Amino acid sequence: MRYDLVIFDNDGVLVDSEPISNRLLAGYLTELGHPTSYEDSIRDYMGSAMHRVHDLVEERTGQRLPADFDDVFHTRVFAAFERELKQVAGVEDVLERLAADEVPCCVASSGSHERIRVGHRTTGLDRWFDDDRIFSSQDVGRGKPAPDLFLYAAERMGVAPERCVVVEDSPLGVTAAVSAGMDVYGFTAMTPAGKLGAATRLFGDMRELTALLAEEN
């Protein structure tokens, strides 16, 4: 394998959280008087940090979301995670193969550290990623699509950007990885391939990833 580090996005790549999160986000925004469909939420907010939700709502309506918006939303999301959240199918096999091949991996997510921990604890992924290998947009000044988060993760893991590959499912994340000078594999399970066109490779089933990485010898 030509890569010395595999950097995983979290939501939609490791845990199947995007349907849950975007369903709840669309519902909460609509409840607050900002009509938003599930499809709107996927298009506008998937892969982004929470500040983007605040910024877009204010830009479009001139109104600010309530001060407790994030806290209420996360409470609802975490409760739903406990009931519904599962790993993305095939992830466990990929992680086992990387471990067997002694290829390091880490997480770099727009989500908060708390959100990542809750999701991993619920799905059992916490056995694969300790806190030293989890990086959040909270750790850097600018989130995706800026490259800062991926560059920070590579620096903390001690690997040069050109030796990293990122696994992403959002246009914002693909843009960030390309800007960081990293190869990026675009996961198209929820995102149309055309929106991830800047990715190095595209794949639609997580079970394909191990073979794709092996092709890069």
Segments predicted by a language model, with ranges:
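N-terminal helical cap/lid subdomain that shapes the substrate entry/recognition surface
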Residues: 2-101, 117
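Residue-level marker of alpha-helix boundaries and capping positions
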Residues: 16, 85, 107, 141, ...
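Hydrophobic, well-structured mid-protein blocks that either form specific transmembrane helices
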Residues: 104-109, 124
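Conserved G/P- and acidic residue-centered "switch" motifs that form tight phosphate/ATP-binding loops
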Residues: 9, 13, 109, 169
